């Protein structure tokens, strides 16, 4: 969160990119070619509408079906809250998009922090927390890390975000998902009533035999 606050302060003082922003943008742009253009323009759509939203919807329905109310509340709160934080930050900070070359997939709203970076990171961070005590956790972490980095790369490759927009989006998303986790505690469950009944029955049998 401190990284996000520091970047936000710099953005308030300087609406353009940071010194290392332009260097990284130009370095990524050097590898630009038609095939990569198509790949990046397609892949970037999975950062929100083609990927994050469908996956979040399916998982929400599964949690609803399983009556995992805390987990469902956690997932929805983190994702919807992430959108609200992103929209608010963009309106308050008014950071313009990079203008180093003509993008094949232009964006016209404000840049800081990156919505795609926030959406992808929020989803993966939330899933890591939800699967923390299961065998799925490492798989989610591994695949999710590749996904998050890939989405971040597409935003830079397409020239629609400064690298600091991406970094800020990641940092605030991690802080947000952890904070909501501490509040909602999605892993907190009530003791199993079935187990309680079994224990009571065992006790009664022990008394009868005694």
Predicted regions and their residues:
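N-terminal transmembrane-helix/juxtamembrane module of multi-pass inner/ER membrane proteins
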Residues: 1-51, 91-104
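Alpha-helical membrane-inserting segments
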Residues: 4, 8, 36, 85, ...
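Membrane-interfacial segments
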Residues: 11-16, 67-68, 92-97, 135, ...
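Membrane-interface loops
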Residues: 18, 56, 60-136
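Alpha-helical transmembrane segments of multi-pass membrane proteins, especially transporters
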Residues: 26, 74-79, 169-170
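Membrane-helix interfacial "entry" motifs
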Residues: 30-41, 63, 67, 71, ...
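Membrane-embedded catalytic cores of phosphoryl/pyrophosphoryl-handling enzymes
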Residues: 101-210
């Amino acid at each position: 969160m401190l990284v996000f606050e520091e970047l936000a302060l710099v953005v308030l003082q300087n609406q353009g990119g940071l010194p290392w922003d332009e260097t990284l943008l130009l370095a990524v742009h050097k590898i630009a070619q038609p095939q990569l253009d198509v790949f990046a323009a397609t892949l970037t759509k999975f950062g929100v509408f083609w990927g994050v939203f469908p996956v979040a919807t399916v998982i929400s329905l599964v949690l609803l079906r399983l009556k995992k109310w805390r987990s469902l509340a956690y997932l929805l709160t983190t994702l919807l809250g992430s959108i609200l934080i992103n929209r608010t930050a963009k309106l308050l900070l008014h950071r313009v998009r990079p203008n180093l070359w003509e993008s094949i997939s232009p964006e016209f709203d404000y840049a800081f922090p990156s919505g795609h970076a926030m959406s992808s990171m929020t989803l993966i961070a939330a899933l890591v927390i939800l699967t923390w005590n299961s065998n799925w956790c490492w798989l989610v972490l591994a695949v999710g890390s590749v996904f998050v980095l890939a989405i971040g790369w597409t935003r830079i490759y397409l020239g629609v975000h400064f690298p600091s927009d991406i970094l800020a989006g990641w940092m605030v998303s991690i802080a947000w998902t952890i904070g909501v986790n501490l509040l909602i505690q999605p892993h907190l469950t009530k003791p199993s009533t079935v187990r309680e009944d079994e224990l009571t029955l065992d006790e009664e049998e022990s008394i009868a035999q005694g």
